[in-house]
Regions:
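Extracellular "leader-to-stem" segments immediately downstream of a signal peptide or signal-anchor
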Residues: 2-4, 10-20, 24-107, 112-125, ...
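Right-handed parallel beta-helix
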Residues: 130-131, 169-178, 232-242, 255-266, ...
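A short, hydrophobic/aromatic-rich structural module that often spans a beta strand
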Residues: 180-204, 245, 250-255, 337-356, ...
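Glycine-rich beta-solenoid repeat tracts in large extracellular/virion proteins
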Residues: 117-120, 133, 137-138, 161-166, ...
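Short, T/G/N/S-enriched strand-turn elements that build extracellular solenoid repeat scaffolds
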Residues: 95-99, 114-123, 238, 247-253, ...
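A short, flexible beta-alpha/helix-coil linker loop
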Residues: 80-82, 303-305, 394-395
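A short local loop/turn or secondary-structure capping micro-motif enriched for an aromatic residue
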Residues: 135-136, 142-145, 181-182, 188-190, ...
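Beta-rich accessory regions
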Residues: 42, 95-96, 347, 364-398
Length: 398
């Protein structure tokens, strides 16, 4: 029997659909209690505050505080980095050394720096000064060995992310520098897996056997841009992400994430979601601006049987004072919804130019749903429709 189409799943689906039916009324009731809906010039990174204001949400949220770091500071130049050269080893050496000494800041100074995968470590703030540009390699070898990641809501071992962390705490990526992904004529792009993730999993049911490393004819899965995984107390603040091969900022299985004052510019590159919250809890997203080739602010919790096996919801998420420019959806739930999306509060935002405003999408084989999803004071100037429910999307592309 297919476990994804039995009666318990139907009950979950019905609950989700009922929540969607009452959703416009929830919007109306909340909106009547507020004075104004923000204009575009009243949201986004230019208005980010120094202090993080208390979070007021219609559900319990912890106090959202930045991680605190020791005064120790290393420049990547001190560990051998030279402009226009590959500096992966120098950056990683600085991060590892600062973490080993109890934490502090690793500084990337102004200049163009070429790198492969960077792995953040506990108690380290990787800080890009204004004028600093990290240009990421498009070669597979620069992202090996493979690491655990989620690709479209399914666990695999592949390239992970351009900036990655696994099972770390008190980590940060900050500053006013830029991170720039490789172009789509690179080796990684040319060797990406050509079948849907469902087909791949059918061929590789054991998670430990899902190794996509590009060797001996194997494909790779496109790396995420920034993806802390199994981490606690994460801060991403101030940086700009450009181009991207795939989803941009994707915390996976994390607890306690703050994303603020971030700019994503990946319009024109398909499947480049802006911020995807993936089976992660206690999240604050504020003062961000996303211009994407896919959905902008997106909530996910795993896909199909694999998502049900992991069974980690995305919950307790607040999005405020943010701007969504071009993209498929301003704020989106799905399409990976297996472990549920709970307690989402989006308020005081502007969606300007997206194809839809608030979007729910999944398909029946993917499981789960959402509950207690609240949206208010959102200004929408859209290229399409305000509210979009797509429960029967295409297998590969929804």
């Amino acid at each position: 029997m297919n476990t994804l189409t039995n009666n318990p799943f139907r009950r979950i689906s019905n609950r989700l659909l009922l929540g969607m039916l009452v959703f416009p009324l929830v919007l109306s009731v909340h909106s009547q209690t507020r004075e104004y809906i923000p204009l575009q010039e009243q949201v986004g990174p230019e208005l980010v505050t120094e202090e993080i204001a208390p979070v007021q949400a219609p559900f319990a949220m912890p106090e959202m505080k930045r991680p605190v770091f020791k005064d120790l500071t290393y420049s990547i130049v001190e560990t051998g980095a030279k402009p226009e050269k590959m500096v992966t080893k120098a950056i990683q050496k600085a991060i590892d050394e600062v973490s080993r000494k109890g934490g502090g800041k690793v500084v990337v100074p102004p200049g163009v720096w070429k790198t492969g995968r960077i792995e953040l470590k506990s108690n380290v703030n990787l800080h890009l000064e204004e004028g600093a540009e990290l240009h990421f390699s498009g070669n597979i070898k620069d992202y090996l060995p493979v690491v655990l990641t989620r690709y479209e809501g399914v666990e695999v071992y592949s390239l992970g992310a351009l900036v990655y962390a696994d099972n770390q705490e008190n980590i940060a990526l900050t500053g006013h520098g830029k991170l720039i992904a490789p172009t789509t004529d690179c080796e990684i792009w040319k060797h990406q897996c050509s079948v849907s993730i469902e087909q791949y999993v059918e061929q590789n049911p054991d998670v430990k056997a899902r190794i996509a490393d590009g060797k001996k004819g194997k494909p790779v899965f496109l790396p995420l841009f920034v993806s802390p995984t199994n981490c606690r107390n994460v801060l991403i603040e101030g940086v700009t992400l450009e181009r991207s091969l795939f989803w941009n900022i994707v915390p996976v299985y994390c607890d306690g994430v703050i994303i603020r004052g971030v700019t994503v510019e990946s319009h024109g590159h398909g499947r480049t979601d802006g911020i995807d919250i993936e089976s992660t809890r206690n999240v604050l997203i504020e003062y961000c601006s996303l211009d994407c080739g896919d959905d902008c602010f997106t909530m996910k919790s795993g896909r199909g049987e694999d998502g049900l096996r992991v069974n980690k919801p995305s919950e307790n998420i607040v999005v405020r004072y943010c701007l969504a420019k071009r993209g498929w959806g301003g704020v989106v739930c799905g399409s990976e919804t297996a472990a549920m999306i709970r307690n989402l509060y989006v308020h005081d935002c502007v969606f300007s130019g997206t194809k839809s405003g608030v979007r729910f999408k999944t398909r029946r084989s993917r499981g789960g749903g959402g509950e207690n999803l609240i949206f208010e004071r959102i200004r929408m100037n859209l290229a399409g429709i305000a509210f979009w429910w797509d429960m029967l999307g295409e297998e590969k592309h929804v």
